[in-house]
From Swiss-Prot:
SUPFAM superfamilies per the UniProt record, alphabetical: TPR-like
Compartments, record wording: Cytoplasm; Nucleus
One Gene Ontology CC term in the entry: mitochondrial outer membrane
Residue numbers bearing the Phosphothreonine modification: T196
Phosphoserine, modified sites: S246, S377, S380
Name this polypeptide is given: IML2-like protein SCY_3392
Keywords linked to the UniProt accession: Cytoplasm, Nucleus, Phosphoprotein
Its biological purpose: May be involved in mitochondrial DNA stability.
Organismal lineage: Eukaryota, Fungi, Dikarya, Ascomycota, Saccharomycotina
Family: Belongs to the IML2 family.
Organism: Saccharomyces cerevisiae (strain YJM789) (Baker's yeast)
């Protein structure tokens, strides 16, 4: 409709008249709105519709190829990181690389022609944001590839993102400060006054054009119609009316779970309404994109850097990276206040941080955060979250998730996150019931389908429902290309525990022999799948864990000379898996008691051999079970007397480690858990000692099996202690 000469052309760009610039600014806002709508379709489990929208936009003359490329990159990034499959990651990387290149060209073009599409920021700022977003997502994919060459390139990309984000963030802060001064002084800047159209006596203000229109433009009906169309697109997106769903307000709940869904009022509201008072209806599309994009990217970047192990963190510090977990979380929270894809990705990141399978904020380390005085800070804002709220967002996080559930009713991704939140609160049965409420076969996004089944299996083992957990996990062999070795081993461990429960009389089943046969077959053949059907060129950390465990089981069978291979397995391996996925913090008292019984009362030749390494694993898990049951001192005594002395001692005031390789994850983990015991026993007075234990955990080894998972948890705990000391 509005062809702007020079856009999309390779030749030198001529200067544009104000009328041409106005048309270009509106076209840019339109294309960004179209891209935001496309990405929202994906978040509602309708990727085909979203990609079709982008195809339609690409086919139009003078469309904004940059935001379209980024939108495709974001869609493909979500698909790649949800499933970690090689082809998906390769495709996303190529698209994001294209978005990077286009962003630099678009930024240069906007600067040359002076295209001021924001009342706050200089020309080209929005493309600086698309560049940093493309760079950051591309770098994350490079890191996930575990190629040394790709990782080196990723550091360079992260560095570029980091510095440009800092620059843009400073521009935002300066612009906000200037805006406040103008409001205080009562002055008005014509350059930042929204454009006003006058037709037939009525006036319409367009916030997307950040300057006064000429008299001719004010009466241009085509220009007015286009501005009104963009306003309508934005209004529909902010209220959730843009992707074909009924009003979200009718689905908005105040509580989690299926019961709250059943308790929704029967009378329906027919008008679409925004779900949050935080949404600014008067904000221009480009300004919204800049704010939310910078907050999301810089926030996630800082949180990730803050969680990295000291060795890597030290290297990054040398090249200028600094990560503040608290500041990063605060920025991500700001991003979630925007009703766009940045807000949604920010919420997914927060859900993973607070309530994900690894739960970086350990429930047992419930230290109250100190409230630091920020009243004198120039950059402080009234709406910023304080330390305690960042640590335990509680209902704020719950309400943010429930808004997304209302806005995207067709997406299993948000339902999965609600189930994870229920699980994090110990409401395991409700979590499973919620996941059962959806027909998994109808989930369009294959990666989300895989995650749903995997999470349900994990939750089921916390409930000791091993039969169904095994069925779920084995079904992933036909759906996911992640790690067939781990899926097979996991299922075998489930059948092993069922067989043991039958042996102990805790479970009556005519399938006892079947459980035995399946456990033996799946556990011992799982290693044959290593290196196959996995997204990386080398085995995953969990794959290496499986290989070591199975080799241990085989060696013990040979050593003891037992006929049944299962008699060569001492501590039940399913309890290790449960620990890796935070099961001990989520089990009820009933399920913790059953865990304790299975760990302490089952007998077989391998257990009776009292192997030192197997006893260490058993005693570590028993100590955690006792702590969660409230027997804190008893659990601590087991850790001090039976676990720590096997690899750790203090001689003449100096820490001495005995380097062991039998179960590498267990040793730093035991030191980490010892810090939590000190906190539980001594409270705030014990924080200095807790920090000592955490530093010992961090110093145990530079690299070990599952070091990333354990190391991030330790680093997050150290940051929490430092904040409270």
């Amino acid at each position: 409709m509005f062809k702007v000469f020079g856009f999309g052309a390779k030749e030198e760009i001529p200067e544009l008249s104000q009328e041409e610039k106005t048309k270009a600014i509106l076209k840019q806002a339109h294309d960004f709105e179209q891209a935001l709508r496309a990405m929202d379709y994906v978040l509602d489990d309708n990727a085909d519709e979203g990609l079709a929208l982008l195809d339609e936009s690409d086919a139009k003359e003078a469309s904004d190829q940059t935001i379209n490329a980024l939108a495709r990159g974001v869609i493909e990034f979500l698909e790649a990181t949800l499933g970690f499959e090689a082809e998906e990651m390769k495709k996303a990387s190529a698209t994001l690389a294209k978005a990077e290149a286009l962003s630099l060209k678009s930024r240069e073009r906007a600067q040359k022609i002076g295209l001021k599409s924001s009342s706050l920021y200089p020309p080209g700022t929005v493309y600086a944001v698309t560049y940093t977003e493309s760079c950051l997502l591309h770098a994350l994919l490079m890191i996930f590839s575990e190629s040394m060459m790709e990782a080196a390139k990723a550091i360079l990309k992260l560095r570029k993102s980091y510095y440009m984000l800092q620059e843009i963030l400073e521009t935002i802060k300066a612009a906000n400060k200037a805006k406040k001064l103008k409001i205080t002084s009562g002055s008005e800047d014509k350059e930042s006054t929204p454009a006003t159209f006058i037709t037939g006596g009525d006036a319409f203000n367009s916030v997307d054009i950040p300057y006064e229109l000429t008299p001719e433009e004010q009466k241009d009906k085509d220009l007015l119609q286009f501005a009104e169309q963009i306003h309508s697109m934005r209004t529909k997106r902010l209220s959730g009316a843009h992707i074909g769903n009924s009003p979200a307000i009718n689905r908005l709940r105040g509580e989690l779970g299926l019961q709250a869904m059943e308790d929704l009022p029967e009378e329906e509201i027919t008008d679409h309404k925004v779900l949050s008072d935080d949404i600014d209806l008067s904000q221009a599309t480009i300004d919204e994109f800049v704010h939310s994009g910078v907050n999301l990217c810089f926030g996630i970047l800082q949180v990730v850097i803050s969680l990295l192990p000291p060795a890597i963190g030290a290297v990054l510090s040398v090249v200028g990276f600094r990560g503040s977990r608290e500041e990063g979380l605060r920025l991500v929270w700001k991003a979630t206040k925007q009703r766009n894809v940045h807000g949604c990705i920010g919420l997914l990141a927060l859900m993973f941080y607070y309530d994900g399978p690894f739960q970086f904020t350990d429930d047992d380390f419930d230290i109250p955060a100190a409230v630091k005085d920020s009243s004198n800070s120039e950059d402080s804002e009234d709406e910023e979250m304080d330390g305690p709220t960042l640590l335990h967002p509680g209902k704020i996080l719950e309400d943010a998730l429930l808004q997304s559930r209302a806005l995207f009713p067709n997406s299993a991704l948000w339902l999965l996150n609600e189930a994870r939140m229920l699980s994090g609160k110990g409401r395991l049965e409700e979590a499973v019931a919620l996941m059962d409420s959806i027909d998994v076969s109808k989930i369009r996004m294959r990666q989300v389908k895989s995650l749903m089944i995997f999470d349900r299996a994990i939750t089921l083992i916390h409930l000791h429902q091993y039969d169904r957990a095994a069925e779920d996990i084995l079904s992933l062999l036909d759906i996911s290309d992640w790690s067939h070795a781990f899926y097979t081993y996991f299922a075998g461990c489930c059948y092993l525990e069922n067989w043991r429960m039958c042996e102990m009389g805790l479970m009556k089943s005519d399938k006892k022999d079947e459980y035995q046969k399946k456990a033996e077959e799946l556990i011992f053949t799982s290693v044959n799948l290593l290196g196959k059907k996995t997204f990386k060129s080398k085995n995953l950390p969990l794959d290496r864990f499986i290989l070591r465990k199975v080799e241990q089981f085989k060696a013990k069978k040979e050593e003891l000379g037992v006929e049944n291979p299962l008699d060569g397995i001492a501590t039940s391996p399913v309890h290790e898996i449960s620990y890796f996925y935070n099961g001990y913090n989520r089990m009820s008292e009933e399920h913790l008691e059953l865990t304790k019984k299975m760990l302490t009362e089952y007998r077989n030749p391998a257990i009776e051999a009292l192997d030192s390494d197997q006893e260490l694993i058993k005693d570590l898990l028993v100590s955690l079970t006792l702590r969660r049951l409230g027997h804190i001192q008893e659990g601590c005594d087991i850790l001090d007397e039976k676990v720590l002395p096997k690899f750790f001692s203090i001689q003449n005031g100096k820490v001495k480690y005995i380097k062991k390789t039998e179960d590498p994850w267990a040793y730093p983990t035991a030191l980490y858990e010892r810090a939590l015991f000190t906190w539980k026993l001594e409270g705030m007075d014990g924080l200095p000692e807790s920090k000592e234990w955490l530093l010992r955990a961090q110093g145990y080894a530079d690299d070990y099996e599952l070091s990333t998972r354990v190391g991030m948890k330790i680093k997050a705990a150290i940051d929490r202690v430092d904040h409270s000391l």
